[in-house]
């Protein structure tokens, strides 16, 4: 009986089960119940993996033991008793070991599908019985390494030969609240030259290109970032009569109007650019070149023009290794990336001003750069301070000599104002800028030549139609006159003249076709590259302007350190004086001072008491307070106490410590500025030298193309006229 009770509390072993079956042979009911229990236990042992997996997959196992964990714990503890009545002890041991191996294999297979290992499942179950909160400590999590590399990043590796092409430009209303409004989307094709089938297509708007270039100029202010075509195509020539001069030459000269005003305007523009230092006008804003301001171009031609220049922009960015290795540049070419989110993230990481960032890479800016002074905030004030004497002299000369206004404006005054307004160092930047060709003058000349070609093509079309109408009129007159007059010679002469007019009309028609083809070739092969050179020139001047601003920032930092040190010396001097006075007061010995204080206190205590009646002043004050209402005295004292320093010694010491810390930070900034300026000088000189070589090569190349196109056009015209001459001679 005791063995039966023990079996109810703890799981029985194989020997105990055999002994109990021998002792209780007469009790058949208890034997049948035990057999049913053993069958249930054997069924749970044969398929324990489902329950075990359910327990292992429970992510909240530390919250307590559930029914499944209780069943699995009992099943594993009662597992060896499954077949005790049918087999011997040795067979049961072998079968139990085999079953356990099978179960372990199932558990291993199931654990491979999980994010954490459950190999110590029995130990964790035993620990969970004591303290359920400790069960989660047995879980060993697997680390999932996502070594994912997109196709774009693979193609952008330095050793890969790739090329970018904008294949098409279509309209889209994706993301627009109003479906009727559409915008132009450009399809970018990233082509692997080694494997042409491995290409990637991406769709981007013009604003995406604009934001990309804007961020690149903020990250790399010293690198010449390739230009992009302007977005809006407007011709402001209608405003020239109202404004009086072009916005880029207005600060230098009144006589330098734009190129549309004939010969005098061209002379003024060239004079303004040649005399003095006309580089300041180029630094202010990038010039829109003549191709954009051509009014005869249609929207389709302008979109094709933009496709070509955006393709050049991306291919030129690929040639710059700093840009090619950027992660967000790969995101721009990745069709799966959301460019709006990427650009917002990058802009949040950049400083507000490029002068407060690392000139080598803005994304690697140290927080100490935020303590630098910003030279762009004090541009106008410093301009008037630095050029005060020059401005007064020039204004006096302008008022006294009205006839010499143009010479003074274009001469030395224009150069000084241009340099001072832009904060350009007269020695460094002008010596660098003299090696850069002024391509804006070439662009103005090209604009006038293209306008003349367009006018000539219109004249050719009118001449062709005129001569064709003459030939038709002459043919009608010959048919009417020959019926009345029988003159063979006159008829033949009229027919010859009719044919001559017809041939000359055909010549002008063919000349119209050839000159239009010339205009198209010059626009794509000469005006576009020339416009890029003009924009590159403004960009290189912008880089030179950045260098001059950094030099100005260095001088501002030196002045700030000088002022801080001066104020620190004054405060330290005041602190020494106060300490000396305090020490002198404390060092003096006053034996009579205590007696004097005691006598003074006694006199104050023995002072005569006031008369018992109410004082007259109280009644007067109460009456005055009843008549007039003044603000409370506590508010006034509080306001005064806020203005007046209550403890000047403590505040002075705090100022001294703050100034010392600030000076230490500024000295660190000074060391950083010295290193940055040396780096900036080297980079600017290197960029200007490389740009000078590139600029001369580009100009030489496009001039050769220009010469080739003109020679081909002239040969076609000669062939047309010689062909007509031979036909007329045969008559």
UniProtKB/Swiss-Prot annotation:
The keyword Transport applies. It is found in: Endosome membrane; Preautophagosomal structure membrane. Coiled coil: none annotated. It is a peripheral membrane protein. Residues 1-130, 253-277, 586-626 are annotated as: Disordered. Residues 164-340 form the PX domain. InterPro entries: AH/BAR_dom_sf, PX_dom, PX_dom_sf, Sorting_Nexin_Autophagy. Residues 608-617 have a biased composition (Pro residues). Its main location: membrane. Transmembrane segments: none annotated. Residues 1-22, 69-82 have a biased composition (Polar residues). Residues 92-102, 113-128 have a biased composition (Low complexity). Residues 31-41 have a biased composition (Basic and acidic residues). Required for cytoplasm to vacuole transport (Cvt), pexophagy and mitophagy. Also involved in endoplasmic reticulum-specific autophagic process and is essential for the survival of cells subjected to severe ER stress. Functions in protein retrieval from the endocytic pathway. The PX domain binds phosphatidylinositol 3-phosphate which is necessary for peripheral membrane localization to the perivacuolar punctate structures. Belongs to the sorting nexin family. This is Autophagy-related protein 20. It comes from Candida albicans (strain SC5314 / ATCC MYA-2876). The gene is ATG20.
């Amino acid at each position: 009986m005791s063995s039966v009770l023990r079996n109810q509390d703890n799981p029985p072993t194989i020997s105990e089960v055999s002994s109990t079956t021998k002792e209780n042979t007469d009790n058949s009911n208890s034997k049948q119940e035990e057999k049913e229990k053993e069958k249930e236990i054997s069924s749970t042992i044969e398929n324990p993996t489902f329950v075990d997996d359910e327990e292992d997959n429970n992510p909240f196992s530390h919250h307590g033991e559930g029914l499944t964990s209780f069943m699995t714990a009992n099943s594993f503890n009662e597992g060896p008793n499954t077949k005790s009545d049918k087999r011997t002890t040795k067979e049961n041991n072998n079968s139990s070991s085999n079953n356990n191996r099978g179960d372990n294999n199932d558990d291993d297979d199931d654990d491979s599908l999980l994010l954490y290992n459950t190999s110590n499942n029995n130990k964790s179950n035993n620990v969970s019985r004591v303290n359920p909160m400790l069960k989660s400590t047995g879980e060993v999590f697997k680390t999932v390494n996502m070594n994912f590399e997109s196709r774009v990043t693979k193609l952008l590796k330095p050793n890969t030969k790739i090329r970018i092409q904008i294949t098409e430009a279509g309209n889209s209303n994706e993301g627009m609240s109003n479906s009727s409004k559409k915008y132009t989307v450009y399809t970018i094709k990233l082509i692997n030259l080694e494997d042409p089938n491995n290409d990637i297509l991406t769709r981007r708007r013009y604003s995406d290109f604009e934001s990309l270039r804007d961020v690149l100029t903020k990250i790399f202010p010293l690198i010449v970032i390739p230009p992009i075509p302007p977005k809006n195509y407007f011709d402001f020539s209608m405003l020239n009569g109202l404004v009086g001069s072009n916005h880029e030459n207005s600060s230098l000269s009144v006589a330098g109007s734009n190129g549309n005003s004939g010969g005098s305007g061209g002379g003024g523009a060239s004079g303004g650019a040649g005399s003095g230092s006309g580089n300041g006008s180029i630094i202010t804003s990038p010039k829109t070149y003549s191709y954009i301001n051509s009014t005869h171009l249609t929207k389709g031609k302008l979109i094709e023009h933009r496709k070509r220049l955006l393709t050049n922009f991306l291919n030129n960015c690929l040639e710059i290794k700093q840009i090619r290795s950027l992660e967000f540049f790969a995101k721009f070419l990745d069709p799966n990336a959301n460019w709006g989110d990427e650009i917002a993230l990058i802009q949040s990481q950049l400083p507000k001003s490029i002068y407060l960032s690392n000139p080598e890479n803005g994304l690697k800016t140290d927080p100490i750069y935020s303590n630098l002074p910003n030279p762009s905030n004090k541009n106008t004030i410093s301009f008037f301070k630095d050029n005060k004497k020059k401005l007064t002299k020039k204004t006096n000369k302008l008022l006294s000599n009205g006839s010499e206004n143009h010479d003074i404006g274009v001469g030395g005054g224009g150069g000084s104002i241009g340099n001072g307004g832009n904060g350009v160092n007269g020695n460094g930047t002008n010596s660098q800028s003299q090696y850069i060709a002024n391509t804006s003058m070439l662009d103005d000349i090209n604009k006038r030549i293209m306008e003349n070609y367009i006018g000539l093509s219109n004249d050719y079309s009118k001449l062709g139609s005129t001569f064709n109408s003459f030939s038709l009129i002459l043919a009608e007159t010959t048919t009417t006159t020959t019926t009345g007059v029988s003159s063979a010679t006159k008829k033949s002469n009229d027919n010859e003249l009719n044919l001559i007019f017809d041939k000359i009309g055909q010549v002008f028609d063919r000349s119209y076709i050839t000159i239009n083809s010339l205009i198209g070739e010059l626009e794509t092969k000469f005006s576009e590259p020339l416009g890029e050179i003009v924009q590159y020139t403004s960009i290189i001047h912008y880089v030179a302007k950045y260098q001059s601003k950094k030099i100005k920032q260095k001088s501002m930092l030196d002045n700030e350190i000088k002022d801080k040190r001066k104020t620190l010396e004054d405060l330290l001097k005041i602190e020494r004086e106060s300490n000396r006075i305090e020490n002198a007061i404390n060092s003096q010995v006053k034996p009579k001072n205590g007696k004097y204080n005691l006598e003074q206190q006694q006199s104050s205590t023995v002072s005569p008491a006031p008369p018992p009646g109410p004082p007259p002043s109280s009644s007067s004050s109460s009456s005055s307070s009843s008549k007039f209402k003044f603000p409370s005295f506590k508010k006034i004292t509080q306001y005064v106490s806020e203005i007046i320093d209550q403890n000047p010694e403590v505040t002075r010491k705090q100022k001294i410590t703050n100034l010392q810390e600030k000076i230490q930070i500024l000295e660190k900034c000074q060391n950083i500025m010295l290193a940055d300026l040396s780096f900036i000088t080297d980079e600017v000189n290197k960029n200007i030298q490389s740009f000078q070589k590139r600029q001369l090569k580009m100009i030489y190349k496009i001039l050769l193309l220009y010469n080739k196109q003109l020679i081909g056009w002239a040969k076609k015209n000669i062939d047309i006229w010689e062909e007509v001459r031979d036909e007329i001679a045969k008559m």
